[in-house]
Amino acid sequence: ASGKGCLLGHDNSGYYQAKKLQGEDNTECDLEPHELKLSPLEIEVTDADGFTNGLAPGVADSHQTQGTKECGLLTAHGNNGLAKSGALDQNPKLLMGVFTVASSNSALTVADLTKAATSAIANTGLGQAHAAVKAIQDANPAANDNTSTSEDTAELQTAIMHLELQAATAGSRNMKEETKKIFTNKVQDTITKVLHNVYSHQITVPFVNNGKDTPLRSIPNTGELMEILAFYEQKVADNTAKTQKELTEAQQAMKTDRSGDGGCTQITEPTACNSKPFCSYNESTTDDDKKCKYNATKATENGVPVAQTQTGGSETTTEK
């Protein structure tokens, strides 16, 4: 029948391990879970015991289903009940066991969701659901404003002492004031922003997730985190060495080039020209006059000594 979408067909209804299934009307159903995007929770939906906004049971953990309040879905039998007529052999459970309909057509039993994590509710599924939701709520950095973190926090002071001041002990330092110097805004506001950025940061490392973008928060193993840190440290070191080599070559070229422009006027390709830390390709002139020129401003910004003589033409503005 049309319109069923991802309702499973008979042929593949039992293959739970598949990542994709063929639904009705040739609809392909992707069973891979989507990445969870956390956002601030409007309300605190759980506490240590259960769901804070769960339906509260009535007297004797039951609600009335008789008389004018009768609901067909919550009634065992009758003209509009679950069984239409006659009685049921067992008490049907609805909504993962939140509602239990009495086979005898007596009062409806409602599970106490506020006790989902305790033995007061005999429903493993609801207990697991509570544990999962609470874990998400607790892990959500946007829901944690860290208002308890301040310049008086001992752990933060110790981190500042070791990392910023590079000291083993505070000595005569006022660590509260030293900590305040580090932050331009309120400490708790800055900490919240940093934690949120760390939590949402994506990394791309060859040996993690086959080089694909991966949320940093999804890597709980400390050893693997240390390997990632070492990878980025080596990457920074390589880039620094490359930059130093280019600057050394540029400085040497400036010393040996007699024209005083580092050889800029000898370069005809725009890309090759602009890649030099002291040359700029002039895009503003006519095609006949386009050429590579020495750029004193760019040379200064890149730490290259400014040429003393410039016989081949110069470009003193920023790179164009």
UniProtKB/Swiss-Prot annotation:
Residues 297-320 are annotated as: Disordered. It is found in: Cell membrane. It holds the Pfam family Trypan_glycop. Keywords: Cell membrane, Glycoprotein, GPI-anchor, Lipoprotein, Membrane, Trypanosomiasis. Gene3D superfamilies: 3.30.1680.30, Variant Surface Glycoprotein, subunit A domain 1. The keyword Cell membrane applies. The keyword Glycoprotein applies. It comes from the Eukaryota. One of its GO terms (biological process) is symbiont-mediated evasion of host immune response. This is Variant surface glycoprotein ILTAT 1.2. It comes from Trypanosoma brucei brucei. The lineage of its organism: Eukaryota, Discoba, Euglenozoa, Kinetoplastea, Metakinetoplastina.
